[in-house]
Amino acid sequence: MYFNSNGEKVSRARWKEMYNAFKNRQELVKAGLTSRRDLMKMGLLTGAGMLIAKKGLSTRAWADTWGGGSCRTGTSGCGNCASPTTRPWMMNMPIPTVKQPIALSALTGPAPTIAPNNAINPATGIAYEGRTRAHQSPIGSNGNLPFPAATVYQVNQQVANVSMSPDLPMQRLWTFDGMSPGPTYMSHYGTPILIRNYNNLPADNGGFGINSVSTHLHNGHTPSESDGFPCDYFASGQYYDQYYPNQLAGFLSTHTATNGDINESLSTLWYHDHKEGFTSQNVYKGLVGHYILFNQYDTGDETTGFRLPSFPNYDIPMMFADRCFDATTGDLVFDTFNTDGILGDKFLVNGVIQPVLHVSPRRYRLRWVNTGPSRFLQIYITDLANPTASNPFYQISNDGNLLPKPVQVPAVALGVAERSDVIIDFSQYAGKTIYLENRLNQPNGQGGPTGSVVGGGQGFLMLKIVVDQPTAVDNSVDPATLPSYYTLPSVSASPRVTRTFDFNQDRNGQWTINGKLFSCNTARFTVQQNSLEQWNLSNGWNWSHPIHVHMEEHQIIKGAPGLYGSSSDDSSNYSRWGSEYCWSGCSTSTASGVNLSRKDTVRLVPRASANIKMRFRDWQGRYVMHCHNVIHEDHSMMLRFDVATTGDTNSNP
């Protein structure tokens, strides 16, 4: 069965035409013509963004993009891919190594400095460091946050050949230290770290991606100059010293006596490239990794604190992604002309297609991250011996934050960049094989409204879990006893200002916020430091947008996302997208269950709205809000806001 980019059935001949158009676009990509400016200069692109039928290029090359919906199967949505056949369960799931600190004297290059090191490196002819702003106070000021940090790392962004499947050739990826995902940073609250991030990426991108980068610590309470602002990119041959304070929010403002609010503790973060205009390509090419924070309660040791399963043996980070591969060569491909959203027909866990994980019959903490680029997930545990049976488990976090208490769930829904920590007791599956299955049928990159949840065993099996390892002592607390974690910080105070944001698309196909495009140089509004604001987010079209705000977390006041339902493909029936969502003409609902939490990304499904409240404490500088369907982000669904001593009251920026 074949579909076009609108989810409509088409003939095999029509699908082949779409595929050939994609191949034409790839020829342009390989020739280095990856920007609209290049194509307009050559007369191949109109000002409205349409490809012109010229030199054999199909007029459908733009309209029927690879991220459309041309599925050749009836499973959980394969996009417009035609990747080579790969055998599942041929490789063990990689667990990225934990990054080890080094001595300050072991850093390559000059010693770290508070101000950017703009001295010219004679070997490259450009500045040693790509940073353009100084580390802000209190870093290095009166010793409050020591500089350089006592814990220092050096990581190299470099090209490497990586195996994703024995049935595909080695893939030439952008990596951190030769790995994708990159190494895992295991950090602790109260211990600042400095990471010297070296850019050693080559000029030859192999068809897509760019070798100037900006690394963002997603969900970090990070000073602006180290946040990975999309326009703070640095070139190949330079380094960038990023300082992560690892301090609780409020440590300089609302909770100085306790060195921050313990209820603002973070746990599961991740890092990824954030280069303006190229985030999707560089992330797709491999620039992602895990960052984990522990404290005196979430300790990484199941005999202390909250007694969650011990890291790293029983606490395992997992990154989910989907990718397309060339049907002939087996090489990773990316459609740079796609502005809607790219879906792959191969599902990866920690960089490998459909791997295997062997576990012991005991409780594990699994940290799930959806890295996209555009696919929404709804993950179930499936036993193929009884695929329709419910296999509930416990969700203990939403994004990077522990819930007040564990919540038993049948599944977890994840938009791009959303995270969930879950606890699964594998003792109930001793000697068995089970699977993590994505049952959300997403036929195209827009993320809805034609998606629905398929039955057990009819979706896409992403990970095979074999419970065959020796029995191990389990000192972790049973989540069924509903232990308490953190208390939600109060957001009952009146906001200093309420701002409204509409996420939409202009007539040229560019994604917008309040009808405006992203600018590196212009802040749309200024937030007053240490204030509370309410932001009302709305999505009036048939698209889904996972909206991420940098710098601090929010709480969803109204319009919280629920699990996707199993409704039919009636596009007027939006109930499938979760009973907690508000649609046009309905009254919004308050958050409950797993959404009664702190978050940094909120899913706006078609015609939905959500109201969030958040504080902006401790740091100043420039930050962004954007759609984390990174295709939308790269095509301007992003805005810059600044945090300063004095803020404005612009309600519709």
Predicted region positions:
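N-terminal secretory signal peptides
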Residues: 1-38, 60-62
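N-terminal twin-arginine translocation
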Residues: 28-41, 47-79
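Short, cationic motifs built from Arg/Lys/His that form the positively charged side of catalytic pockets
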Residues: 36-37, 367-370, 499
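A long-range scaffold signal marking pre-active-site subdomains of enzyme folds
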Residues: 56, 62-227, 231-237, 241-268, ...
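Extended terminal and domain-junction accessory segments
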Residues: 64-152, 280-321, 388, 398-546, ...
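Non-catalytic, beta-strand-enriched accessory regions in extracellular/secretory proteins
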Residues: 171-173, 177-184, 344, 349-356, ...
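Extracytoplasmic beta-sandwich strand-turn segments characteristic of Greek-key/jelly-roll folds
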Residues: 180, 185, 213, 217-264, ...
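Histidine- and aromatic-rich segments of cupredoxin/plastocyanin-like copper-binding domains
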Residues: 219-248, 320, 324-481
